[in-house]
Each structure stands twice: as structure tokens, then as C-alpha cells.
Swiss-Prot record:
Interacts (via c-terminus) with CNGC15A, CNGC15B and CNGC15C (via N-terminus). The Nod factor has no effect on these interactions, implying that the complex is maintained after activation. The gene is DMI1. Disruption phenotype: Loss of microbial symbioses. Undergoes typical root hairs growth deformation in response to Nod factors, but exhibits no calcium spiking and nodule formation. Residues 378-403 form a coiled coil. Required for early signal transduction events leading to endosymbiosis. Acts early in a signal transduction chain leading from the perception of Nod factor to the activation of calcium spiking. Also involved in mycorrhizal symbiosis. May be involved in the regulation of the calcium channel responsible for calcium spiking by mobilizing another cation, and thereby altering the membrane potential. Its main location: nucleus. The keyword Cytoplasm does not apply. This is Ion channel DMI1. It comes from Medicago truncatula. The lineage of its organism: Eukaryota, Viridiplantae, Streptophyta, Embryophyta, Tracheophyta. Mainly expressed in roots and nodules. Also detected in pods, flowers, leaves, and stems. One of its GO terms (cellular component) is nuclear membrane.
Amino acid sequence: MAKSNEESSNLNVMNKPPLKKTKTLPSLNLRVSVTPPNPNDNNGIGGTSTTKTDFSEQQWNYPSFLGIGSTSRKRRQPPPPPSKPPVNLIPPHPRPLSVNDHNKTTSSLLPQPSSSSITKQQQQHSTSSPIFYLLVICCIILVPYSAYLQYKLAKLKDMKLQLCGQIDFCSRNGKTSIQEEVDDDDNADSRTIALYIVLFTLILPFVLYKYLDYLPQIINFLRRTESNKEDVPLKKRVAYMVDVFFSIYPYAKLLALLCATLFLIAFGGLALYAVTGGSMAEALWHSWTYVADAGNHAETEGTGQRIVSVSISAGGMLIFAMMLGLVSDAISEKVDSLRKGKSEVIERNHVLILGWSDKLGSLLKQLAIANKSVGGGVIVVLAEKEKEEMEMDIAKLEFDFMGTSVICRSGSPLILADLKKVSVSKARAIIVLAADENADQSDARALRVVLSLAGVKEGLRGHVVVEMSDLDNEPLVKLVGGELIETVVAHDVIGRLMIQCALQPGLAQIWEDILGFENAEFYIKRWPELDDLLFKDILISFPDAIPCGVKVAADGGKIVINPDDNYVLRDGDEVLVIAEDDDTYAPGPLPEVRKGYFPRIRDPPKYPEKILFCGWRRDIDDMIMVLEAFLAPGSELWMFNEVPEKERERKLAAGELDVFGLENIKLVHREGNAVIRRHLESLPLETFDSILILADESVEDSVAHSDSRSLATLLLIRDIQSRRLPYRDTKSTSLRLSGFSHNSWIREMQQASDKSIIISEILDSRTRNLVSVSRISDYVLSNELVSMALAMVAEDKQINRVLEELFAEEGNEMCIKPAEFYLFDQEELCFYDIMIRGRTRKEIVIGYRLANQERAIINPSEKSVPRKWSLDDVFVVLASGE
């Protein structure tokens, strides 16, 4: 029976499927199924074993603190049914699993994550990383605090035991001792808190420096918002804000130093309070003394107190070093500001010069001479140069300014702030110098400066004198500036003076005397005592001046030069005179003069002349028109330069010059280089009456280069002329001198060494002095004459109308006349007598040059003293051009 039961049990076992041994891995939450070996398989003797495992489709769940997020679980699916029913055999006892087998089985059961799951895990890791840093920061903060709470709890327990044990003592001695102990305990607690605050303050900068960039991520995580990956890191943003703060606010450095000092005092006081037994007020005071004086910590006792005091003293030394650096920088910056000319000029009635050029030296000289009579003045120069450089250039002039102060400021005349810095609204005169560049750019800059001056809100008290480079740009500047603008066209002034000096040798020296303030110059003034007098009487009413014209009040202030003798001076009229200074002349009683008998000689007729232009100027068309008005018919103008003939015709036509409409002169074109000898030798240099060496347009931007070419041309022409002696066509010379038979001065100028009159245009006044001393040229015209004209117009804007008329080809002009027109040889006359005789020719005699003197005398003194005159003398007159 028992045997049958055993067999039936064996049959039941054989009919059942193979048992699965299940082993659970608690750490990985996995379930491993191990199937016993099948007896039908060949494993060793009986066959091989087959292992089957059942897994669910869920993802492996890692703890959240490891960085990989968990997914929701899915229901476990039952294993699929086997394809074949197992053979009902009694399996052998399975071999127990070893440790190695267990590891192999476990590793084989771990699923390999796909690429998408890896990316998802990385994103989850990057998202949870701020939490990790937040936990770290919280741990750093909470661990000391928890230790402090534990310490305080222990203290409270001890206090409780002490209080319970000393109740009898407290009842006998009162509550005073208990209160003191409680206060001591409170102080100990506060010192502990102070110590933790100090430690936390020391650790906080390092933590912020390390993890400051993660703070926005933590904030975004707490707010449940997505972070912007393109945001600038917080560390860079803070550095940028600090940089902007120090750049914008001028007192940022001082404020930062003050905050650092207060922080060091407060931090040091807190640290001292934590390590000493004193009060908080005493700790703060000691902290201040350590900051102010590093030697105060020498007497401290105790290790903690010494460490804290030394640290505070070191910080104090650093702060005081920073303070000294800031003070030194502030002083240096202020000194540099003063040295560089950035401070404001507080002046009134000064002359303001805008710009910088080679004319500035002679301009300052003339203005200083003009201010000599009033004890000096103030001249302010505003230019786009360093103040030190300007002052060095002015010091090189080696000129005595005679009490006049020259103040230089660095800035741009185009900026209103710089104009206000030099008190532009309070200046009595403003001079705008042309820039050292081509004419169009220079005039365009002058126009912008005039617009800037017109934009001054306070208005302008004085007038503006603008130096122009091109005559065509003058109307535009006057249109923009209005009545306050007076223009001086430098190129045009020199060109017209060159023509006048070429036709009348010696006239340049006279113009130099009249335009400069060293001798006689023009003045306009009202004299009420001269009202109702005829002009012929006014002419001899000034012992120390020579009247030249009248400013007619009834005609809108028009200046009439050389008026009619019968003109009666009316109320409001002013008299134009030539005098040494504005305070050196006054009307006096009428002197006794005698007209007498004198020769009535008419002006000789004009004869054709031959003139050579070497070089090409921008305004050469204007010079040709002036020559057309001055020269006699049949004259020739030779033009020798490198500009092709067709290009010349085009430029002359652009200047509105009708070449075929010229009646008095004939243009002869020659192409060549004026600094090459063989080109000059092709010209009949010995046949010209006058040779004008012009500053060439191609090199006008460089003063030194232009002067070098002019000097080379001058020397070559003189050498060629000397080699061609004794041949000379004297026709033109004899024709010119026929009307001046006794004029030894003109003969001396023209026939010296049998050479033509050469007028050179030298731009630099220093080069001009060298040429004048060497006497290789009859006369040299330079920018110094333009500077004189600018200074004269700056002193009185009305003089500009006088100069414009005298420089023009029409109207009154300055001439040199021989003595035979006014007297007989060795006749004894005073200067007043000669002035009266000159009125019969509608001329105003303003000076003379004696035969034995080199320079002419304008506005001579002692006009009523008679003297003997020679026919070799010449007189300087203002004559009508009719």
C-alpha cells in the first residue's frame, strides 16, 4: 500500500511541469527564476541544462538621489505558455548556485539602456543637479546650526540642574546672582551666534564664487520654470554691473571704499565680540582703532583676540593703501585735466582763436602789439591739439607778448561744450583759422564752425572773422553767419598783393606797414568837434594822423574812401584815419598851408608788359582778371606749369573766365616743371618785366614742400638770368621807367643785377625771413600778411570793407608816385603842403620814401615842419582808380 502510494506520488510528480525555483534580489527589486535541467537534454552524461527567465517590461528603478529618474510601473504580464509540453521525467536534484553563478545570472538579467533612455537620463541628471548644490548649501548652513542647537540644549540642561540644586542659595542671596548668571549665559549665547556669523561670512564668499552661476538654476527649479540656456552666467553679470557702476558714477570708488571700511569695522567688531569678554560697542571701537592704526593690536592678549586683531589691522592697511591710491589718482587726474587744458576759461572781452595753423604765430604777435596800448589783454586758443604741445609751439616764437596772456585749451570748435568752455559768448572777437588741408575741406570745416557758433544759446557778443581758402565759398559762409561774419580770403589777398607788388615794386613793404600794428594802421572814430567841416579841412586837422575817408551815417554806415573835398561832415559821421594807435591822435587847430605853384604833370600812359606765372593756383582766374584791369593792351601773360593746356582751359572755364574775351592781355601757355633747369632754360627769362613764383596747387597741403619748390624755382631763375648776361631786352624796362625818369627807387629795384622783378610766394614766415635777408628775391609775400589782415579785422570789423576796396581792381588803390608830380627839385615844403597839392590830383598822400632811405614812412610826424625834397623821392598815395 505504501509502495503504491509512493508510485502514485511519483507519477504525479512526472505529470507536473518542472518546478521553478524563484530567488528575489531585494536591492534591485528583481525576480529570478531558475528552471531545473531537463532530463531529455544532454548535459554531461544526461544532457545540458536550459535556463529560462521571466521579466516584466518595466524600466529599472534607481533611487532618486543617484540622479536617474523613475518611471511608472506597469503590470506584470504572465509568461507565455511553452511551445512544447515538458517531458514528464523526474528531474535530478539541481546543483546549488554558487556566488559566481549568481553574479553572472544577475548581470545577464540587467537590461541594457537604449540611446533614448540615456539622453533622457542625462536631461534628468542636468535638471536635478541644482538640487544637489542646494542640498550642499543647506548642509553647510544647517550643520553648524544644529551643532549650536545641540550645544544650547546641553547648556540648558546643565542650567536646570544647577538651578534646582541651588534653590536654597538663591533664596538666601536673592535673585541678583541668578540674573547675572543668566546674563552671562545670554552673552555666551550671543558670542556663539557672533562666532557662527563670522564663520558663515568667511565661508560665504568662497561658496558664492564656486556656485554663484547655479543660483539662477535653483531659483528656476523652485519656481518650476524652465531655464534659458542663453542667459549670461550670473558671475559675469555681476562683474559687468560692477564695471558699469565704477564707469558711470564718478564717486563710485570712494563709495566702495567707504562701504569696505564700514564692513571691515563691523565684521572685525563682531569677531572681537565673539572671542573677547567685552561688550559689542567696545568691540566695534577696538575694531576701528585696529583699522585706523595697525600698531594698536600689539598689546592684545589671547590667541583668538590676536588673530582677529592682526586680521583687522591687515585689512585696515589694505584699505588705507586703497585710499591713498584713490587720493593720488584724483590729484593726478585733476593735474592732468589742468595740464591738458580741460578746465573752463572764465574771461571777458577776450579774443578767441579757433583752430591751429602756421599763421597763428604772427597772428598772436599782431594781437599782442594791438593790446599794448591798453596794458595787454587775453587771447584764448581752442584747437584740437594737446595743451602742452600748443604751449611749447608758442614758447618757440621767442616773442615778448607785452602783458598779453595766451591761454590754450584743447578741444574741438565743432562741439558746443568746448565752445562754452572758452567763454565764447563773452569774447569781443572770434577768429576762425583755416585748417592745413585743401581748400574745399578747410572751407567746409569753417562752415561747420560757423554753424556751431550760431548754435550758442547765450548768443555772441563779438563778431566772427573767418579765414577762407576759396573765394567761391565766401558767400555761403556769409549767408549762414549773417551780419556777425567777416571773411578774409587768404588766397585771394596774397594773389592780389602779388599782382600789385609786381606792377609797383616796393608796395609790399608799405602794405606790411599798414596792415601790421607795429607802425600805422587804419582806425575809425567819431569826432563831434569836426561836424560841419569840409573834408579838405579835416584832411589837415590831425597832427598825428592822416584822414583817408568818412563813414557816412546817413548811408547806412557806408565807408567812402577819398571823398570829395566839398563833402561836409554831418552828425553821426565818423572819420577813417591812418594813425599809430587809437589813442595817439586827436584833431587840432587848422595849420597854415600854402598851395603855391607846382608842375602839372599827368600820369604817363601805360605800356604793354610781359609777365610770367610759375606755378598754378586755384584762384589763378581771379588773378588774370586783376591783370586784365591793370595792364595796358598788348601785354603778355606767360603761364608755365605742369598742368596740360587742355586742362588749363577747362579749369579757367570752370572759373567763369572767358579766355577769348580778354582785351588787354594775351595768354601764352608753356608746359614744364618749374624745378627742372632744362625746362626753365626753354623760357626767355631775361625778357620778362615781372616773374611771379606761385605756391603750386599740387603741393599746397604741405607748407614745407611748397616753400621748397618755390625756393628751388627762385634760385634756378636767378642763376639762369645771371648766365645770360649781358644780353637783355631792355624794351619793356625802358617803357616802364619812361614815366618815372627820376624814380631811383623803382630803377634800383628793377635794374639791380639786370634781373626781372621776382615776387615769391613763401607760405612759412620763417622761410620768408631767410629769403628776404639773402636778397635773392625782390620781395616775398607770405601768410604773415594774411595774419595781419585777420588781426586788424578782429580789432575792428569795419576795416574789412576798407581792405576789400583797396585790394579790388576797381575803386581806390594804393600807389607809389614820383616826387615830380608834386614839387620841383630841392623845393622846401612841409608835408601838409604836399597833401594839399595831392588833392588837386584827387589823391591822399599818406607817406613818402626819401632817396637815401630803404623804407617808406607812413603817417610822418611833424607834418608842419618844412624840408627840402628831391626828385628822387617818391610818395605813397591813395588814388582813385578812375
